[in-house]
Amino acid sequence: MRASCTPLKAPLRRPERLASSGRFAWVLLLAPLLLLPTSSDACDDPPRFVSMKPQGTLKPSYSPGEQIVYECHLGFQPVTPGQVLALVCQDNNTWSSLQEGCKKRRCPTLADPTNGQVILVNGSTEFGSEVHYVCNNGYYLLGTNISYCEVSSGTGVNWSDNPPTCEKILCQPPPEIQNGKYTNSHKDVFEYNEVVTYSCDPSNGPDEYSLVGESKLTCIGNGEWSSQPPQCKVVKCVYPAIEHGTIVSGFGPKYYYKATVVLKCNEGFNLYGNSVVVCGENSTWEPELPKCIKGHPPRPTDASPPNGAEGLGAGYIVLVIVAVLIGVGLLLCLYCCFCRQRKKGIYVTGESHRQDILFSL
């Protein structure tokens, strides 16, 4: 008994696949055609201008023969008064030509303030420009120092602020001080750069008054003096005695403000500190008095480096030693080479039993 099996075959679907691929190919071929510009009977968007804008609201499209009327922006005015500024959509779907038809308005010309000056930052008074105000020496500015040309009521332009004024710089009398006075104390007001000088009164006691601080004050601003007033007080320092030392210069029975003394130590003692001291405003020596100590002198703290080879110190000595060693080494090498060459120049021949000495140059 025989059994035969016939293999089953899958149904063929190639025609359907080919049809699907064909449709996709047609889509790819037709897609670029959809992107091609189509002819239209309308003009594109109208051009933009810096000084002008369209009147009203723009339409989505304009047909040939239609026009757009322009007007000036705020702060601008027509170059030619009465001229109609318009664009026309032409038959070829392009706009007619139109130039900028407006220009910037100008603010009123400003005069220099009394005792001052107005500076045109942009070199003109056109819309959007600015000016700066400055006062002459001895005067201060009252008001706003910068003004801008901007849109005012309606379509006009004007300056943003009123012009300032330049007022004379004056100072009130400077402060009075105890035990002292200043010049021109009878005046109620002082002008710019005017100077007053302070001085101390005579003392009723055994010690005189010292003027501590600036003796001259200058009116530098509106109600402002150059510095604080000085003081008149007794400034007296004690006798600058140091153990194992003496005064070199600046001797005096009393030592008042800014008295200067030079000190030195006795033989065998060294000075630690400053040799020159000054009587300060707090009745103390500045800097403090030095000390004289027996023994070796103190190390210099701020000695300047000497000039020449001495300033090089140990580094210079090391360089000299290295240079000498290198020189000796070179001489030894030359000597060894010379001896080796002499040995190469002597040889013996077996035929004549002679020694020929050859000298190599």
UniProtKB/Swiss-Prot annotation:
Membrane-crossing residue ranges in chain numbering: 312-332
Pfam families: Sushi
Quaternary structure and partners: Interacts with C3b. Interacts with C4b. Interacts with moesin/MSN.
Record keywords: Complement pathway, Cytoplasmic vesicle, Disulfide bond, Fertilization, Glycoprotein, Immunity, Innate immunity, Membrane, Phosphoprotein, Repeat, Signal, Sushi, Transmembrane, Transmembrane helix
Phosphoprotein recorded as keyword: yes
Cystine pairs: 107-149, 135-166, 171-219, 200-232, 237-279, 265-292
Protein name as it appears in the record: Membrane cofactor protein
Post-translational events: N-glycosylated.
Gene Ontology BP annotations: complement activation, classical pathway; innate immune response; negative regulation of complement activation, classical pathway; single fertilization; T cell mediated immunity
Sushi domain boundaries: 43-104, 105-168, 169-234, 235-294
Functional note: Acts as a cofactor for complement factor I, a serine protease which protects autologous cells against complement-mediated injury by cleaving C3b and C4b deposited on host tissue. May be involved in the fusion of the spermatozoa with the oocyte during fertilization. May act as a costimulatory factor for T-cells which induces the differentiation of CD4+ into T-regulatory 1 cells. T-regulatory 1 cells suppress immune responses by secreting interleukin-10, and therefore are thought to prevent autoimmunity.
Positions glycosylated per UniProt: 122, 145, 301
Membrane topology of this protein: Single-pass type I membrane protein
Biological source species: Bos taurus
Sequence ranges on the Extracellular membrane side: 43-311
